[in-house]
Amino acid sequence: MKRTYQPKKRHRERVHGFRKRMSTSNGRKVLARRRAKGRKVLSA
């Protein structure tokens, strides 16, 4: 059985990246929450 996580840089960026987060209102909420929490890394 193959493993479920087969990492790809492009997919990671496109699905979880900063620009993807900024493109939707809910994504911006995610970033705002992570800023409020003081996360060093906001997105992939």
UniProtKB/Swiss-Prot annotation:
Q: Which NCBIfam families match?
A: rpmH_bact
Q: Name one GO molecular function term.
A: structural constituent of ribosome
| PROSITE patterns hit by this protein | RIBOSOMAL_L34
Question: Which gene does this sequence derive from?
Answer: rpmH
Q: Which Pfam families match?
A: Ribosomal_L34 (PF00468)
Q: Which BP terms does GO give this entry? A: translation
The cross-references to HAMAP family, in alphabetical order and at most eight, read: Ribosomal_bL34 (MF_00391)
Top-level division of the source organism's lineage: Bacteria
The terms describing its cellular component in GO are: ribonucleoprotein complex; ribosome
Q: Which residues form a coiled coil?
A: none
- Enumerate the InterPro entries for this protein: Ribosomal_bL34, Ribosomal_bL34_CS
**Keyword Cell inner membrane among record annotations:** no
Q: Which Gene3D superfamilies match?
A: 1.10.287.3980
Q: What is this protein called?
A: Large ribosomal subunit protein bL34
Keywords associated with the record: Ribonucleoprotein, Ribosomal protein
Organism, as annotated = Leuconostoc citreum (strain KM20)
Region (Disordered) spans which residues? 1-44
Q: Which family does it belong to?
A: Belongs to the bacterial ribosomal protein bL34 family.
Q: Where is the composition biased (Basic residues)?
A: 1-22, 30-44
Q: What is the lineage of its organism?
A: Bacteria, Bacillati, Bacillota, Bacilli, Lactobacillales
